[in-house]
Amino acid sequence: MINLRKTHPLMKIINQSFIDLPAPSNISAWWNFGSLLGACLIIQILTGFFLAMHYTSDTLTAFSSVAHICRDVNYGWLIRNLHANGASMFFMCLFLHVGRGIYYGSYLYKETWNIGVILLLTVMGTAFVGYVLPWGQMSFWGATVITNLLSAIPYIGTTLAEWIWGGFAVDKATLTRFFAFHFILPFIITALAIVHLLFLHETGSNNPSGINPDSDKIPFHPYYTIKDALGLILMFMVLLLLALFSPDLLGDPDNFSPANPLNTPPHIKPEWYFLFAYAILRSIPNKLGGVLALLASILILLIIPLLHTANQRSMMFRPVSQTLFWILAANLVTLTWIGGQPVEQPFIIIGQLASMLYFLLILVLMPLAGMFENYMLKPKW
């Protein structure tokens, strides 16, 4: 009998993607994050689906419906905690996945990289509209502050903001449409993830050395299925640890109070995974300038392939670039910390310096390091 997985039209696609796929023999645990992100997406869609069965997107009942889910729905507290902390796991994996791509030069697969950046932006948008849904204080004021940034766009800004709101402020219409966006976007993310994989499988995976691995490939199954399974178990353990023992660790206490347009919280800040971008936004005293810097902080990823000057693909054998990469990582941690601090000295100046260093590293120092390393590798005799 002819092997069904190699002949059946549907099974054939699965086989070529997850079973008989030729994979480099030396890819490390840093290559696990793709499958972990896929698992995160599935967890988020499933838990979100069950939450949507009980949630109501109305300003009068949204907050109560979330409380009802946690108190009265069977395992509702668990579903909600898994969904909220699943988002944190999603972003943790996303940041590590992007960092891996930068470190090992995976961005030179330009189509895969660009779809990945679009995926990152879409996930950020989904997380933002999702954070508004419980209709707590931070949900409401976060939505107000971020959507208000649209009004910085010259001429059409105010009209655009009111169009997004569906009125003159964040209100019932905004909440309803944000719920609709939050429901549809994960399916768009799933479609984009499939396209991301499609482009990746056109070229095959990169590997830590950055050298063409075609001469030494192994089948994806069983080698990388078992490796991915280990990663999944570890990630799921961390997620359960968070969801069961400290579900509110990464949340904001202000969100336990129902939204009140008449009472502004002392410190408006987004979830931890947006703090680095929020710090960059706040570091520029001009509204439009801040919005442009915020956009640039993410969109800069699109031009990273153009800034690659080194003769070697990976940073594995490039100590100067490695040093700058880890400075960039530390800088992002600093920005995340600053984003959660009040707007006062010394946090203002630290945030401004860290924001400046962020762009300086990516646009100037790392390309220069690549050129310097090329020069150092040239024979001098």
From Swiss-Prot:
It is found in: Mitochondrion inner membrane. GO terms for biological process: mitochondrial electron transport, ubiquinol to cytochrome c. It is a multi-pass membrane protein. Keywords: Electron transport, Heme, Iron, Membrane, Metal-binding, Mitochondrion, Mitochondrion inner membrane, Respiratory chain, Transmembrane, Transmembrane helix, Transport, Ubiquinone. The chain crosses the membrane at residues 33-53, 77-98, 113-133, 178-198, 226-246, 288-308, 320-340, 347-367. Gene3D superfamilies: Cytochrome Bc1 Complex, Chain C (1.20.810.10). Binds 2 heme b groups non-covalently. GO terms for cellular component: mitochondrial inner membrane; respiratory chain complex III. Pfam families: Cytochrom_B_C, Cytochrome_B. Heme 1 (or BL or b562) is low-potential and absorbs at about 562 nm, and heme 2 (or BH or b566) is high-potential and absorbs at about 566 nm. This is Cytochrome b. Heme b b562 binds at residues 83, 182. CDD domains: cytochrome_b_C (cd00290), Cytochrome_b_N (cd00284). GO terms for molecular function: metal ion binding; ubiquinol-cytochrome-c reductase activity.
